[in-house]
Curated annotation (Swiss-Prot):
<comment type="function">
    <text>Involved in chemotaxis. Part of a chemotaxis signal transduction system that modulates chemotaxis in response to various stimuli. Catalyzes the demethylation of specific methylglutamate residues introduced into the chemoreceptors (methyl-accepting chemotaxis proteins or MCP) by CheR. Also mediates the irreversible deamidation of specific glutamine residues to glutamic acid.</text>
</comment>
<feature type="domain" description="Response regulatory">
    <location>
        <begin position="16"/>
        <end position="133"/>
    </location>
</feature>
<keyword id="KW-0145">Chemotaxis</keyword>
<comment type="similarity">
    <text>Belongs to the CheB family.</text>
</comment>
<dbReference type="InterPro" id="IPR035909">
    <property type="entry name" value="CheB_C"/>
</dbReference>
<dbReference type="InterPro" id="IPR011006">
    <property type="entry name" value="CheY-like_superfamily"/>
</dbReference>
<dbReference type="Pfam" id="PF00072">
    <property type="entry name" value="Response_reg"/>
</dbReference>
<dbReference type="InterPro" id="IPR008248">
    <property type="entry name" value="CheB-like"/>
</dbReference>
<dbReference type="InterPro" id="IPR001789">
    <property type="entry name" value="Sig_transdc_resp-reg_receiver"/>
</dbReference>
<protein>
    <recommendedName>
        <fullName>Protein-glutamate methylesterase/protein-glutamine glutaminase</fullName>
        <ecNumber>3.1.1.61</ecNumber>
        <ecNumber>3.5.1.44</ecNumber>
    </recommendedName>
</protein>
<dbReference type="GO" id="GO:0050568">
    <property type="term" value="F:protein-glutamine glutaminase activity"/>
</dbReference>
<dbReference type="GO" id="GO:0000156">
    <property type="term" value="F:phosphorelay response regulator activity"/>
</dbReference>
<keyword id="KW-0963">Cytoplasm</keyword>
<keyword id="KW-0378">Hydrolase</keyword>
<feature type="domain" description="CheB-type methylesterase">
    <location>
        <begin position="170"/>
        <end position="362"/>
    </location>
</feature>
<dbReference type="GO" id="GO:0005737">
    <property type="term" value="C:cytoplasm"/>
</dbReference>
<feature type="active site">
    <location>
        <position position="182"/>
    </location>
</feature>
Length: 375
């Protein structure tokens, strides 16, 4: 007897969702949105952290949606306690204020799977589908198997002292590191970037998240790392020790090689593109200089970056993919691995060292092949 996909899905138990938000309006809105997806079932609501704690103790849930800003115990504090006592998938709800963006990035670093923006202009069908998919995918994951707190902030003077040697130095050999990440990427990047050479090849990253979040994330990384972390600027030469994040400005970020080294440039968004900025767009822009490039694709939902990594690998780049065990969502790296684009599949705690060694190996090769003038 024939059965279609929807009929098959109806036999799969729905993922149980607990909504935690002090706003009754937001709780009602979110319940309505999630009710449109048969894969999800809202099993409870809580207006504050205490109610949420009591509910979790007595009732099973596969995923929690958690407001960041609540009276009493904040969502961020509750998340921190939850991850210590009973780790489970959490999707944060945040406003687009500066305070909300900073807290959202902290939440993603502390173990939240994803962060959804609260609506500002009414109900939207595409937004509804996106929220349902992200909550469902979060419910299918487990908290990343990373040690929380590894990326603690360094003393304020440590990064400045280490930056002095790299400041203003162009990357003459042309080496470049490219990284793409999505869901789970904040904690993954905080595991990778500290292990890179602080005076080494520049790094350009596409991390899927709203623009305000990217600004907060770049500032957070800049406080944590000896590297110089900032959002990409068009036409500015990339220097040794730079870590550049593609901004969320409605345009894609590409890299281009000039006489004085690598630069970033912005290109118009393709309406057909699912993500902006796009990992694929970044990766494809470096194919002509692939032999100078090391590239990594980290945890994330979907397939953005897989085709671009394949083209880079075919053109001579060194490629790395995060393994399934340490990925929050084994989507982007899975597709890239399936295409044969990933040359080295590694747990997240080994990718930073592998990227660093790949650039050191490139530098040694360059020195061996450089002709030395006769004396």
């Amino acid at each position: 007897m024939h059965s279609d996909t929807n009929e098959h899905q109806s036999h799969v138990p729905a993922k149980k969702v607990l909504i935690v938000d002090d706003s009754r309006v937001i709780r009602m809105w979110l319940r309505t949105v999630l009710a449109s997806d048969r894969r999800l079932e809202v099993v409870g609501e809580a207006s504050d952290a205490v109610e949420a704690r009591d509910y979790i103790r007595a009732n099973p849930a596969d995923v929690i949606t958690l407001d960041i800003e609540m009276p009493g115990m904040s969502g961020l504090e509750f998340l921190t306690r939850l991850m210590r006592a009973r780790p489970m998938p959490v999707v944060m709800l945040s406003s687009l204020t500066s305070k909300g963006s900073d807290a959202a990035v902290q939440a993603l670093s502390r173990g939240a799977i994803d962060c959804i923006l609260k609506p500002t202009d009414g109900y939207d069908l595409d937004l509804s589908r996106d929220i349902c998919e992200r909550v469902y995918q979060a419910a299918c994951t487990r908290p990343a198997s990373l040690k929380r707190g590894e990326a603690t902030e360094k003393p304020a003077d440590a990064p400045m002292m280490q930056r002095a040697s790299a400041l203003g130095q162009p990357c003459r050999r042309g080496s470049l590191i490219l990284i793409g990440a999505s869901t789970g990427g904040v904690s993954a990047l905080e595991a990778v970037l500290p292990k890179l050479d602080p005076d080494g090849a520049p790094v350009v990253i596409v991390q899927h998240m709203p623009g305000n979040f990217l600004e907060s994330f770049s500032q957070r990384l800049d406080r944590q790392l000896p590297q110089n972390v900032k959002l990409a600027e068009e036409g500015v030469p990339l220097r040794r020790g730079d870590v550049i994040l593609a901004p969320g400005i409605g345009k894609h970020t590409e890299v281009v090689r000039r006489m004085d080294g690598w630069q970033c440039r912005f290109v118009a968004n393709d309406p057909a593109a699912l993500h902006c900025p796009s990992v694929d767009t970044l990766f494809l822009s470096a194919v002509s200089e692939a032999k100078k490039v090391s590239v990594a694709i980290l945890t994330g939902l979907g397939k953005d970056g897989a085709q671009g990594m394949l083209k880079l690998a075919e053109a001579g780049a060194t490629t790395f993919g995060q393994d399934e065990e340490t990925s929050v969502v084994y989507g982007m790296p899975r597709v890239a691995f399936g295409l044969g684009a990933v040359q080295h599949q590694l747990p997240i705690h080994k990718i930073g060292e592998a990227l660093r060694e790949s650039k050191n190996a490139s530098a040694r090769t360059a020195r061996r092949t450089t002709k030395v003038p006769l004396q």
